[in-house]
Amino acid sequence: MRILYNSRDPQYKTPFGTVRTGQSCFLRIDIPKTCAAVRVTLVAEDCDGKPYREIPFSRAEETADYVLWRTEFTLDRGLYFYWFRVEKPDGSFRLFRQGDGTNMEAGEKWQLSFIPADFSVPDFARGAMMYQILPDRFYQVGQCDLTDKLRPYRIHADKSETPYYTADAEGNWCNDFYGGNLAGICEKLPYLQELGVEVLYLNPIFMAYTNHRYDTADYKRIDPMLGTAEDFSRLCAEAHARGMRVILDGVFSHTGSNSVYFDRNHVFGDGAVSNPASPYRGWYCFRRYPDDYDAWWNMPTLPNVNELAESYMSYIIDDDDSVIAHWVRLGADGFRLDVVDELPDEFVLRFKRRLRELKPDALLLGEVWEDASNKRAYGVSRRYFTDGELDSVMNYPWRNAILRYVKGEDDGTALGQTLETIAENYPPQVLQCLMNCLGTHDTARLLTVFGDDFNGTKAEKAERFLTPEQRKTAIDRLLPALLLQFTLPGMPSVFYGDEVGLQGFEDPFCRRFYPWGREDKSILALYRAVIRLRKESAALRGGELRLRTAGGGRIAYERVCESQTARVFINRSDSIWQLGAEGQPEFSVGLICCGDELALQPNGLCVVFT
């Protein structure tokens, strides 16, 4: 007989997942009578694996075969890992996690986070639909203002051209532009509103040399090719009038070398390189002035900053006209923090507090590629949620699990485990506003991922597109992925152009210009269908997630709220799945109905409401 404990089962642990400080956590463990246990102890370790506290269980009731042991406790705010010690008259053994159950002496430790009692996220972000735009690549209105554009640059004469993937004659990279601007985004707000967008996430708009603009030249100035501060204010005002919020990309771990602050090219006159007495000199770490300095991933165009330098913190966060204050007053509703794992916790927490002072319902999300609840960076356990630093993160573990499942590389069991791990490890309010992205500026285009595993040179990838057969495969995989994206908790995020079938391998090919006039209307129809399904369902937007079945090529789960239950079934197996009498199907592909009985054909899917 096995020892019974499942941290995801309310019989054995409440509350589910994270616990607020001051709130009690209740645990139960069932030990066979044949084990003759005389003492059971929960051993809690801190985030660094050091002993923190031992919590005894009390012998509670008995069943025919088991003794039920219970405990109640609370811990200080923080991230913990725990296991059990079971003592018997003739010795003791340790108990660890194995899947949903337990295992003696080997396995993983359970994770438990105590979060701030007042942890909250903006209401507007819960379940909202996000749309990500790389501003240079979306839409252009009027002529580009090149008067103050940092040089040299290259302008595409044809919006359908492939992004350049080689350096220019002087060895410069990422300096080709298409001319997309803020006025262009503003003009397309009716399209975005009709699509169902509620949050606009803009990749960097600050003045910079490159087209991606992650090499900031001036934090308080719009890149002249994108427009003016007035253009940004107008965009925010019109977006707000249409029920949308606007989130900016904040790049604060490094600046550009060609910037007001560093001025390696001696363009601005008062940077750390061009002026040894520069007020920005203390922001940077020079090993040998002025040419040898600390840079992001050793890229000389991206000098790292010392984020904890008081003058830098004041400039970005605390001053009356700080960078945060400047953009919030112009209309921004929050920030995404680029490479947040390279920003010190003190910086992130101070940023969050100041942002909320300026706009109490502002959103702060971070770029994290792993499970953010237990993320370690440079040997330090990050406190994104245990200190309430972030409201949300980019949900890449979720993305990877969905792609592997839909492509047949993993089964429903693996996907279900990932979904349950995320739900258990993240605070429930964070779960509702996770940035659930299937594609971003840092990944290959979704249609390409689903249709082509080609691994050639950049020159080969530049003009490679799906064949008709590959496209059919990609479309067959796209719908189940979209159904998962728009029926699971969080903010489903669409990267501009994915909804109309834009193709491309990794950067820079995933950053083509939006194909206005050449949209794939059949793919757009799929997006509209799942967006409408979510928008019309209270359960799909904000209901509790309950996993029902996960195995083989199949997965089923529920979203439950007071007024409605939505049941989602996806069958990626090669056999018919008998569902029984589940309710009224509202959305389906490959559904077989026989009276009240439902079944799904191979590669079928459906959503049922009760």
Q: Residue spans of the language-model regions?
A:
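Substrate-binding/active-site clefts of carbohydrate-active enzymes
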Residues: 134-198, 205-330, 351-358
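C-terminal beta-strand-rich structural cap/linker in extracellular carbohydrate-active enzymes
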Residues: 31-33, 80, 595-610
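Beta-strand-rich binding/interaction modules
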Residues: 29, 36-53, 80-82, 575-593
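Carbohydrate-binding surface patches
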Residues: 14, 26, 548-582
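Conserved, mostly hydrophobic/aromatic
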Residues: 29, 133, 192, 202, ...
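Active-site-proximal helices and loops of the catalytic beta/alpha 8
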Residues: 236-245, 253-254, 259-270, 333, ...
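The feature marks proteins involved in alpha-glucan
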Residues: 1-24, 48-132, 138-158, 164-165
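Aromatic/acidic polysaccharide-binding cleft in carbohydrate-active enzymes
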Residues: 136, 378-379, 385, 435-466, ...
